[in-house]
């Protein structure tokens, strides 16, 4: 894995975390952030970086990012805050 690929993965990781932080509900925010962190830790813990494995991981991450973008839009469109004070 060369330096350019590492930079691309870090950039993709930051995009995923940024998109996950856009959820208005903190529970979704934390869940998707933790899921992304876990995926990247699992991938980086493997010391054998094959180009084919890296490509499939990048494709999975792009799919995950696109899914997050769609879900944040939908969630925030229909998000309803609960009243803080009950009558």
Curated annotation (Swiss-Prot):
Keywords recorded for this protein, A-Z: Mitochondrion, Transferase
Subcellular localization(s) per the UniProt record: Mitochondrion
Pathway given in the UniProt record: Cofactor biosynthesis; iron-sulfur cluster biosynthesis
GO annotation (BP), single: iron-sulfur cluster assembly
Transmembrane keyword on record: no
Molecular function terms from GO: cysteine desulfurase activity
Pfam families for this protein: Complex1_LYR
Cellular component annotations (GO), alphabetically ordered: L-cysteine desulfurase complex; mitochondrion
Matching InterPro entries: Complex1_LYR_dom, Complex1_LYR_LYRM4, ISC_assembly_LYR
Residues annotated as transmembrane: none
Family (UniProt): Belongs to the complex I LYR family.
Description of how the protein assembles with itself and partners: Interacts with IscS; the interaction enhances cysteine desulfurase activity of IscS. Component of a complex, at least composed of IscS, Isd11 and IscU.
Function in brief: Participates in iron-sulfur cluster formation (ISC) pathway for iron-sulfur (Fe-S) cluster biogenesis. Enhances cysteine desulfurase activity of IscS.
Protein's name according to its UniProt entry: Protein Isd11
Gene: Isd11
